[in-house]
Amino acid sequence: LDQRGIADRFLSQGQVAQVAGFAWIPLDISDFPTRHNYGLALRQNHIERILAEWVADLGVPIHRGRAVTGFTQDDAGVGVELSDGASLPAEYLVGCDGGRSLVRKAAGIEFPGWDPTTSHLIAEVELAEEPEWGLRRDAHGIHSLSRPEAGGAVRVLVTEPHPGRSGEPTLRDLGEALVATYGTDYGVHSPTWISRFTDMARQAASYRRGRVLLAGDAAHVHYPAGGQGLNVGVQDAVNLGWKLAQVVGRTSPESLLDTYHAERHPVAARVLRTTMAQVALLRTDDRTDALREFTSELLGMDEPRRRLAAEMSGLGVHYDLGEGHPLLGRRVPDLDLVTANAPLRVFTLLHDARPVLLNLGEPGGFDITPWADRVQLIDAKYVGTLELPAIGAIPAPTAVLIRPDGYVAWVGDRTQVGLADALTTWFGPPTAA
């Protein structure tokens, strides 16, 4: 969000908090070498509203109240069928329509994984009786009753006694789960919303089928631990967006889209494994309690904590772009630079989603004229230690090629070997003189 210049919109409405954790074991990230070494507590509906406002600022239309009912595709494009009988022509279709994705099913993309072993209800409601506030762990699972805002609705989290129910949850379902756990439903009434989630873990076998791609929950579902689902979905979009724009804009070949699956599928596969591990640690028998205590001791040590916290926060993502400098395939740090004109932050250079060749060596040492219509060339100096959240201090390079998603596509260490190939691979062939 900071890379696009909109982080302040979220910071002004959220609450800085220590929200990183593994199976509810806190993971402190305050010593991470990043500008935002903390979590931000902000409800999802607020996040959606802020993003919708930004989309409106960019002049992108959102067609609400119209559902996709099907599509056809051929070599020329996609025809999207809508619930009002209309159809939309498009070059590509990206299914971001959740775990029950119609787009994924219609594309014939398999969704293998693991069935649920536990089921939870979460809701905002009113209670007629004073409840047992706070967190509760018992043989059924983990439950909590809280009032996040003074005078506001009660937030309920309760484990259902029998997993496997499907469909939209009802007030009756919630009442039955409360009775099973607390012996009473506390006179629950007036729900603002009720939602069900499970520990089902599934991932699309492929993120692309022809001109159809998947992102977010349509591509992967898992237990909602540590906010990873939202983070991974946003990172899917950030990875895919600029690639799709270049292909549609005819600056890159269609094969660039294949790198989306190659990069993002392993990331989500790892998230599925870590969330399954967390569910196992949240079980409430004595043996699991012993394992949880042992895990908590391990995560109290700096090295295991830093490694897992980087993974849980998304700051440790590393795309396999080959061997080389430790920065290759990792997110570029938001360095404070000195340029001929003024001080500058690296993330400021990414606000308009254009790639950047950042030259930290002698000014004028690079000529990228054949890509100048697509890639910014910035001569700058950086004084200080270069550190990454996942791996610590690393050698400072003389130049880095930064993709629009903030990940490093090439690193120069007093050499330009491989730069032209990287420019062509990621940003299309050179423009003829």
Residue ranges: model-predicted function:
Residues 1-303, 378:
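Core Rossmann-like FAD-binding/catalytic domain of the broad FAD-dependent monooxygenase superfamily
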